[in-house]
């Protein structure tokens, strides 16, 4: 997805993350620039490399690499107290880039599937057949109270919460501890991911590899 950078992904020269009018661009002059309506952000690395690329490492840090050097041109945040794992940088509706992680929950990895876009942030909810969607995949909070991950057709179920018929007018919410829960209209909890992290901001990303993954808490943001 063009608004998400995951650990192991690479943004090449003159490519970008984008969300509506905002863009996070790895420019040809080796400068990383966030163009938005709130002052933006830049790495101030123009002229310090050639054919530069942007990566997100397994400590939740952004790295700029030059084709003519084995040492990163730029690493940010410079000092982090994070564990190794899988992180996610998202360009969100606030027009800022925020790094979340490490991943604390996911649907099972699908086998032999190609490696499209949507995210749910802490405190946001999904209900009445609302969904996160990618090229081939959809994560749908169905009106029968079942949370379902499908590929292609609505009947091709990759994963489900198994809560069909267990409540009425159910909604799914991502909490500020990274826990996903499904609740009915009487506020009875019918499903919980049982993945409680430290208090903070989390994000659920439906990735293009067919996994829905919760990352967090947020470890850095251009809004800081």
UniProtKB/Swiss-Prot annotation:
Residues 2-111, 117-222 form the Bulb-type lectin domain. SUPFAM superfamilies: alpha-D-mannose-specific plant lectins (SSF51110). InterPro entries: Bulb-type_lectin_dom (IPR001480), Bulb-type_lectin_dom_sf (IPR036426). Keywords: Disulfide bond, Hemagglutinin, Lectin, Mannose-binding, Repeat. The keyword Repeat applies. This is Mannose-specific lectin 3. GO terms for biological process: response to other organism. It comes from the Eukaryota. The keyword Repeat applies. On the 2D-gel the determined pI of this protein is: 5.18, its MW is: 48 kDa. One of its GO terms (molecular function) is D-mannose binding. Heterotetramer of 2 domain 1 and 2 domain 2 chains arranged as a dimer of domain 1/domain 2 heterodimers. Disulfide bonds join 30-52, 145-170. The lineage of its organism: Eukaryota, Viridiplantae, Streptophyta, Embryophyta, Tracheophyta. Gene3D superfamilies: Bulb-type lectin domain. SMART domains: B_lectin (SM00108). It comes from Crocus vernus (Dutch crocus).
